[in-house]
Amino acid sequence: MLKIRLARGGAKKRPYYSIVVADSHSPRDGRFIEKVGTYNPLLKKDDANRVTLKVESIQEWLKKGAQPTDRVARFLAAQGLVAWTHGNNPEKGKPGKKAQERLAERAQREEERKQAEADAKAAAEAEKAAAAEAAAAAAAAPAVEEAPAEEAPAAEAPAEEAAEG
């Protein structure tokens, strides 16, 4: 199968690519059939020499069945040679199995923590309510005990007056 792809050249940290037609089994920078263009990523994006293509030669190879790689297809689409569509791979961005398991565990721990906080808050509210109820009962109980105590001396006072008189 024939591919139209990039073959890297240039020095370390200074890439320069040749756009070549090559067998898909040959190495990236190895043997190729024909050089059909160049790509220099170091030049500015609006520079005319950033991508140079031999359009007639590329059209011939496309007719013969050569398949462009994604990056080369973008260059060819810019020249109007092929219709390039953005590939959509929603699976690529998803985390792996282990990461999903860790996320599930973290979510479960967070849920348990929130539940524990809610339980603790409810227990604190119940304790407060019980303490308030006990305080109210304690306040009501002495008031009830004191009220008959006040009446009793008042009842004794007339009895004492009657005994004296």
Swiss-Prot record:
InterPro entries recorded: Ribosomal_bS16, Ribosomal_bS16_CS, Ribosomal_bS16_dom_sf
GO CC annotations, alphabetized: cytoplasm; small ribosomal subunit
GO biological process: translation
Region (Disordered) location: 84-165
This protein's record includes keyword Ribosomal protein: yes
Protein's name in the database: Small ribosomal subunit protein bS16
Family: Belongs to the bacterial ribosomal protein bS16 family.
GO molecular function, one term: structural constituent of ribosome
Compositionally biased tracts (Basic and acidic residues): 89-130
Classification via HAMAP family: Ribosomal_bS16
PROSITE patterns membership: RIBOSOMAL_S16
Keywords, in A-Z order: Ribonucleoprotein, Ribosomal protein
Amino acid composition bias (Low complexity), ranges on this chain: 131-157
Keyword Ribonucleoprotein: yes
